[in-house]
């Protein structure tokens, strides 16, 4: 019976600990950008020459 209060306290401490993301971030996780940021980046993207290939058609997007 002496272990029960210790167990309850430990359980409460574990429950109040900060959580960790279950899924690690990947290179495809990007923060949401505002419209202003998008407007500034679009001309830069359009002016860059791109090497598109048949295997990776998404590089042209």
Curated annotation (Swiss-Prot):
Propeptide: 23-50
Cysteine disulfide partners in this protein: none
Reported modifications of this chain: Contains 2 disulfide bonds that can be either 'C1-C3, C2-C4' or 'C1-C4, C2-C3', since these disulfide connectivities have been observed for conotoxins with cysteine framework V (for examples, see AC P0DQQ7 and AC P81755).
Predominant localisation class: secreted
Top-level division of the source organism's lineage: Eukaryota
InterPro entries: T-conotoxin
GO cellular component, one term: extracellular region
Signal peptide, first to last residue: 1-22
Cellular localisation: Secreted
Molecular function (Gene Ontology), one example: toxin activity
Keyword Protein biosynthesis annotated: no
Residue stretches spanning the membrane: none
Keyword Nucleotidyltransferase: no
Keywords for the protein's UniProt record, in alphabetical order: Disulfide bond, Neurotoxin, Secreted, Signal, Toxin
Tissue note: Expressed by the venom duct.
Pfam family, one: Chi-conotoxin
Similarity section: Belongs to the conotoxin T superfamily.
Comment on protein domains: The cysteine framework is V (CC-CC).
Protein name per its UniProtKB record: Conotoxin VnMRCL-011
Protein source organism: Conus ventricosus
Lineage: Eukaryota, Metazoa, Spiralia, Lophotrochozoa, Mollusca
């Amino acid at each position: 019976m002496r272990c029960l209060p210790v167990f309850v306290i430990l359980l409460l401490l574990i429950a109040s600990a900060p959580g960790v993301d279950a899924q690690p971030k990947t290179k495809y996780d990007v923060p949401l950008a505002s419209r202003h940021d998008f407007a500034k980046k679009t001309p830069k993207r359009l002016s860059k020459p791109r090497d598109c290939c048949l295997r990776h058609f998404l590089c042209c997007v």
